[in-house]
């Protein structure tokens, strides 16, 4: 009888310590980041110089901004994008960690020409999505937009920053 009481007390203590442990672990919630228009970007066909799209854009220039990109956002309107600006032209590779919606990732060289496009990058995918040539600028837009616009390697961008 005493053994059963002791066993019951031990089981009760284990259950209580386990339940206390669970309640002390807090889930960290991240607040969704909202879009802030910081400039405008125009995509043009290289062969005709015709405008295929005009976008409101956010810039990613700091290390934090380039590491975070469009993470923790639920969606983005089709006329928006994020332009990553790097100090030099180099091989680039992006991934979709913590990115909740599919993207087209468009790589540009220092002459503002498309060098490659990674289409329909899957949400939360940690696979490497490299440029096919050195890039200085990278534009992230909603998946499928590059096909809708009919852009390809050699097409160009122009962009401007809002005056502060």
What are these regions (language model features)?
Residues 1-2:
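N-terminal secretory signal peptides that target proteins for export/translocation
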Residues 5-13:
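Sec-dependent N-terminal signal peptides
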Residues 15-19:
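C-terminal motif of bacterial Sec signal peptides marking the signal peptidase cleavage site
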Residues 21-164:
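Compact, glycine-rich, soluble single-domain proteins
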């Amino acid at each position: 009888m005493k053994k059963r009481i002791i066993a019951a007390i031990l089981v009760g203590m284990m259950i209580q310590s386990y339940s206390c442990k669970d309640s002390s672990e807090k889930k960290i919630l991240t607040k969704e980041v909202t879009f802030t228009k910081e400039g405008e970007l125009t995509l043009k066909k290289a062969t005709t110089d015709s405008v295929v799209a005009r976008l409101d854009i956010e810039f990613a220039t700091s290390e934090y901004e380039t590491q975070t990109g469009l993470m923790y956002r639920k969606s983005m309107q089709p006329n928006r994008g994020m332009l990553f600006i790097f100090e030099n032209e180099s091989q680039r590779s992006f991934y979709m960690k913590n990115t909740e919606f599919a993207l087209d990732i468009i790589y540009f060289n220092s002459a503002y020409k498309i060098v490659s496009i990674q289409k329909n990058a899957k949400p939360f995918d940690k696979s490497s999505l490299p440029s096919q040539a050195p890039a200085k600028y990278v534009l992230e837009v909603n998946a499928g937009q590059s096909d809708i616009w009919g852009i390809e390697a050699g097409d160009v961008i122009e962009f401007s920053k809002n005056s502060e």
